[in-house]
Amino acid sequence: MPYERKIINDPVFGFINIPKGLLYDIVRHPLLQRLTRIKQVGLSSVVYPGAQHTRFQHSLGAFHLMSEAITQLASKGNFIFDSEAEAVQAAILLHDIGHGPFSHVLEDTIVKGVSHEEISLMLMERMNKEMNGQLSLAIQIFKDEYPKRFLHQLVSGQLDMDRLDYLRRDSFYTGVTEGNIGSARIIKMLDVADDRLVIESKGIYSIENFLTARRLMYWQVYLHKTSVAYEKMLISTLLRAKELAS
């Protein structure tokens, strides 16, 4: 039987292959499709007009990097079952499913005290019921309850696929070139030791560049004074509306 897949052309990574089956069903699901209408960097477009990319695009990019990372780790003798590979790919596709509009603004107003990670988990569990338990392993990995801890680190850690994608993607769309990182080289340097994600010694320079790029992106994009001011005004507006409605 021929390998069936959906091919998506991504401006950052080129062609992204999504296998037909569970992963493609996740991509088509209304809860993930909702992210096509949510900007990845919230109100940063008031400063960087090109920053119109969405959390859906980011989720696909992180999925692509996860696929590359799994292949690389397996090539170094780290045994990963097909079911585990599919589950960790599902987990990264769904990691931002709980995000609302305007980045983290809603966490400080409408859904105060509830993080987007908690909402993501709640929605994942709802989807798992719809899909007759097919996401159970992905949820275990997402919650860091699976024995192979390095799989969770690929989803949420200091050097996860989430960060590798958003730094390259946000750099690309904002035009802040200082944020561009060599994600391909970093992934090639990944390995596992004592059930933890590690980097080969010859990849240290790439990690230093990654840390520097992340810091520069926070200074120039995520914490830019103008977009932060816009967020503060929006928070004040939403809190006032909430007060009047109560």
Set out the residue ranges of the language-model regions.
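Sequence-structural signature of the catalytic-core scaffold of metal-dependent phosphohydrolases
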Residues: 1-39, 46-90, 98-246
